[in-house]
């Protein structure tokens, strides 16, 4: 991702060779030094990691911090598949199925996926009423905030805490619930208006028909007012 940012997008702030290896006296960087380089841009994520149980485990085992999961030179775009207990998950490389870490990874992954599904369902509900011409600005704002909660929860994965990630996911779920309620109310308003329009059209039709028949009667020869 850093190479794409630098070479394709032209982002000169993206890390390059010199950031880890130096300029003139280039050498092999210490593992801890690379983590410090990452923290210059990913400061919040790094701070969450430093306060997590993984920090002490990495230090005691001599495992690199950021590189252990994200690599060094070939840093790929992150995805939710990296989390959890699936075949592509990184957690299972160290945590056995009976371990606490395995269960925590499973729970965090499920909470993230649940929020994603809830957001998708809310988008579909809001989209349907929006296509009917209803005002859904507030519902869309709720969905945007829920997406922000999802992004924040993904960052807080680095706490490796089911409770901390779960609390953020709950914030997102609350916003999604509000969006769904707004969409439901908009749908009910649309149905009420539609019934009102139908009733009004029916009244106009009856009035017009009555008036037409009255005129026809009056126009017949020999009929008086």
Annotate each language-model stretch with its function.
Residues 1-117, 121-124, 128-138, 152-163, ...:
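Inter-heme linker and motif-flanking segments adjacent to c-type heme-binding CXXCH motifs
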Residues 33, 146, 222-225:
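Long hydrophobic alpha-helices with heptad-repeat/coiled-coil character
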Residues 94, 143-150, 166-180:
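Amphipathic alpha-helical bundle/coiled-coil segments
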Residues 117-120, 172, 198, 205, ...:
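Alpha-helix boundary/capping detector
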Residues 139-154, 196:
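Long, amphipathic, charge-rich alpha-helical segments that form helical bundles/coiled-coils
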Residues 184-203:
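Juxtamembrane/start-of-transmembrane alpha-helix segments at the extracytoplasmic/lumenal side
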């Amino acid at each position: 991702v850093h190479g794409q940012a630098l070479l394709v997008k032209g982002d000169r702030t993206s890390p390059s060779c010199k950031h880890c290896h130096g300029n003139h006296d280039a050498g092999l960087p210490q593992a801890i030094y690379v983590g410090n380089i990452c923290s210059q841009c990913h400061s919040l994520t790094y701070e969450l990691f430093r306060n997590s149980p993984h920090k002490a485990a990495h230090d005691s085992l001599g495992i690199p911090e950021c590189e252990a999961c994200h690599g060094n030179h070939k840093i790929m775009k992150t995805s939710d598949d990296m989390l959890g207990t699936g075949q592509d998950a990184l957690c299972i490389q160290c945590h056995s199925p009976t371990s606490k870490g395995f269960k925590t990874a499973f729970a965090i992954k499920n909470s993230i996926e649940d929020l994603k599904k809830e957001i998708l369902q809310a988008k579909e509900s809001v989209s349907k009423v929006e296509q009917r011409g209803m005002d859904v600005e507030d519902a869309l704002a709720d969905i945007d905030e829920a997406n922000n909660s999802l992004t924040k929860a993904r960052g807080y994965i680095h706490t490796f805490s089911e409770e901390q990630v779960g609390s953020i996911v709950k914030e997102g779920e609350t916003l999604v619930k509000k969006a769904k309620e707004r969409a439901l109310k908009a749908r009910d308003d649309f149905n009420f208006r539609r019934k009102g329009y139908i009733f009004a059209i029916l009244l106009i039709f009856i009035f017009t028909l009555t008036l037409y028949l009255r005129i026809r009667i009056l126009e017949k020869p020999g009929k008086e007012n």
